[in-house]
C-alpha cells in the first residue's frame, strides 16, 4: 500500500497478525516516527516521491509488476478496495457519537483523499439525518475535494507540499468524492500558517496532536471569526482528532 502514516500502520499490524509480508510506500515528507513504527511492525518501507500521490503511483505500478495484493485507502475507476478501509473507520465515529449527550449541530471533518471524511459523513447522515451541518476541511495546498466538487468529477490539483502531511493529497478517492458530494454541506481550506497556530493553541491547553489532526478544529475557529455557517453560542461542534503528535 501507500500511506502518509495511519493507514500504513493499520495494514502493517494486520499483516503481522496474519503472518503476511507488507510493503508500505511513503513519500519523503512522511515523519520519521511513522517510518520507524512501520519497520517495528515488520513492514518494509519504500520511500518514493515528494507526495502521497507519487508514492501511491509507485505502489500501484509495483503491485501490478510483482502480482502483489494492493490494499489502498483510496479508490479509483475499477478499484474499490478502499471501501473496506472506509468501513473500518466507522468504528471511530460510532464511538464518538455514543459519547455525545446531545447531537452536534456542526461536524468538521478533515480530508486527504477523503476516505475517513466520507465514511464519517455517511454514518452521521444515517444516524443524525440532515440536521447537522457537515464541513469538509482540506489544506489550502491540496484542496482536491473542493476543486472536484466545482468540476463535478475527481480532479487533480497542483501545489507545494503541506505541513498537514496526512491531508496532503492532490487527487481524491473516487468513491469518497461521490459520497461527499451528497453528504457534505461545505468544503473549506485552511493554510499551513493557520494550522500551526491552531495546533499550538491546543498544545498550550494540553491537547498534543498533529497539524493534520487539528484541521477540523482550526476551521471551526476560522469560521467562527467570519460568522459563517450559523456558528453561534448555541453551536455544538464535533471535531475529530485522528492522531496524536507525530513529531
Language-model segments: which ranges?
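A short, small-residue-rich loop immediately preceding and capping a beta-strand
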Residues: 1-26, 104-116, 237-241
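Buried hydrophobic positions in well-ordered alpha/beta secondary-structure cores of metabolic enzymes
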Residues: 5, 15, 38, 96, ...
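Short, acidic/small-residue loops that bind anionic groups at enzyme active sites
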Residues: 19-34, 127-141
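Small/polar-residue-rich loop-to-helix segments that shape phosphate-bearing ligand pockets
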Residues: 23-106, 149-188
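Glycine-rich ThDP/TPP pyrophosphate-binding loop and its adjacent helix/strand module
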Residues: 91-128
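Active-site-adjacent helical/loop segments in soluble small-molecule enzymes
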Residues: 172-232
Amino acid at each position: 500500500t501507500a500511506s502518509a502514516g495511519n493507514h500504513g500502520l493499520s495494514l502493517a499490524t494486520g499483516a503481522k497478525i496474519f503472518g503476511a509480508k507488507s510493503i508500505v510506500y511513503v513519500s519523503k515528507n512522511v515523519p520519521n516516527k511513522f517510518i520507524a513504527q512501520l519497520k517495528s511492525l515488520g513492514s518494509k518501507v519504500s520511500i518514493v516521491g515528494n507526495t502521497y500521490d507519487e508514492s501511491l503511483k509507485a505502489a500501484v505500478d509495483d503491485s501490478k509488476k510483482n502480482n502483489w495484493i494492493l490494499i489502498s485507502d483510496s479508490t479509483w475507476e475499477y478499484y474499490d478496495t478502499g471501501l473496506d478501509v472506509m468501513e473500518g473507520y466507522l468504528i471511530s465515529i460510532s464511538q464518538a457519537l455514543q459519547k455525545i449527550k446531545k447531537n452536534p449541530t456542526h461536524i468538521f471533518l478533515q480530508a486527504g483523499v477523503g476516505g475517513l471524511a466520507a465514511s464519517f459523513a455517511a454514518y452521521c447522515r444515517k444516524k443524525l439525518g440532515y440536521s447537522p451541518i457537515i464541513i469538509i476541511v482540506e489544506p489550502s495546498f491540496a484542496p482536491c475535494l473542493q476543486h472536484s466538487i466545482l468540476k463535478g468529477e475527481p480532479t487533480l490539483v497542483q501545489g507545494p507540499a503541506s505541513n498537514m502531511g496526512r491531508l496532503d493529497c492532490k487527487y481524491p478517492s473516487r468513491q469518497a468524492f461521490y459520497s461527499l458530494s451528497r453528504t457534505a454541506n461545505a468544503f473549506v481550506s485552511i493554510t499551513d500558517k493557520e494550522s500551526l497556530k491552531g495546533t499550538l493553541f491546543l498544545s498550550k491547553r494540553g491537547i498534543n496532536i498533529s497539524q493534520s489532526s487539528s484541521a477540523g478544529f482550526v476551521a471551526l475557529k476560522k469560521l467562527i471569526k467570519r460568522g459563517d455557517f450559523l456558528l453561534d453560542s448555541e453551536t455544538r461542534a464535533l471535531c475529530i482528532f485522528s492522531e496524536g503528535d507525530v513529531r
